[in-house]
């Protein structure tokens, strides 16, 4: 008789070896995609997905992007970049193929391009995917509607994946796989989502579902998220469809039980390498029963949703958010690690209610209070992707709200962590930020484009010191002005260049000098410890439940507590957390002059004046 235990040991040894080999390949792909210019110049640089990493952190490592070099950025006028169609999706950058490096860009006309990253000329193109939808949708704000979400690339198989909405007697979403080096459609693709995606007896309907978010590729399955069309029309649901890249006929899906619950954010599906995270919006006709909306959800491979409290979080006021159309899922999920915090592995949601929420991503907790929350915006948070990064000063997240403000907040390494204001810069457009660093720790710069002239955008590139918000790159001159930039879009970084895709064109920006070879050790940028008397105060007004409220944000104070003065009168003493909302009790026209001082002293900030016209 065979030794069954020995046989089991042989089988498990083989499986473990196979899993280790697969993990090594996947880890290498992720490593190559995330380290950018920190690698020697003979190593590959690849930007394969939305915000460069599955966590959607938006960080790009490129040794050339020191603050002094970044200040001299100019547009490469010799780069053509001509394409056809409107662009809402982030471009990608792929190396390692027979044609050399490529910029991959997709458009709402259902066109796909591979461009030479230096000359901007076409390497290959696909203009035969199918006609985009230009009419016949019950509502919406994207027309034509074709390829909206950012694609994803599998380097191992050299495959490009994207979702295209194609017009016809029946309007349909198709998930495509192309050879990234030639543009040819891979065998057994595309996948007809209408025909293959079902969940609990519910069929997918492209007429009700829009695809906006970036695709994710996790352990051999490509995940695509769906919302409704702008206007909340039709019987749409929040959907995540999973397609195994080696067996595309075996389609998996999950959807919200209630109508609504769309996944709206530009980042789409985030992942920790095993599980997927999405944030949903408002639902309808729930009779007060939570049914998948206004929530952070953790999905297992497939996708599979367990329904257990460990795998979802919704605020206790979710029903009020539903009633007010204040989607929790205004911004896509961002995974944040905070060394020293308890818990340290978090997921961020930024809601249309102007709040930020942090939740333990290893145990989301069900319907309960978050680990941390804060009012972080004087305008709606929606549509964009946030970023997260680490400097010598701590862990941050930053985002661009509907009012045009770029806001940065620090997450404290405490038990539990707290959200503390870091800096903000004045309004321009709605683009999603991204971050450069010379080595993963130093010289952090937050970049953003003031997208979409229809929403007050200046259509220029801007760069800010990631610790302080100080301007590093102010948009350039006449040559650096872009046109046709779309709200919520984001740029990428590769080989000492920034690429940003807009309507009918991909713009390339270059550093004034080549990326150093070999990569030098980056010089740390250290912010000095503030000394008394150097308190810097910012303030702006907002209405909170009709009450005149002055939002105060400061830096440089060293005392444990802060005295807050309004019009020369002490109105509050508060912990030194860098922020305080001064609720005046007034509702009409008024002017307020505020300052903050280290408690019990005359070491004070500048005075800020805030006017309320009515």
Question: Which sequence ranges carry the predicted segments?
Answer:
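Ser/Thr-rich, Proline-interspersed low-complexity disordered segments
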Residues: 513-531
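Pro/Thr/Ser/Gly-rich low-complexity, intrinsically disordered linker/stalk tracts
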Residues: 528-558, 602-614
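Beta-strand-rich modules
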Residues: 584-601
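Sec/Tat signal peptide C-region and signal peptidase I cleavage site
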Residues: 39-43
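Recognizes extended acidic, P/S/T-rich segments that occur
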Residues: 563-589
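N-terminal secretory signal peptides that target proteins for export/translocation
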Residues: 1-23
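Mobile, glycine-rich extracellular loop/lid and propeptide segments
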Residues: 44-300, 310-339, 345-362, 385-389, ...
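Bacterial N-terminal signal peptides
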Residues: 26-37
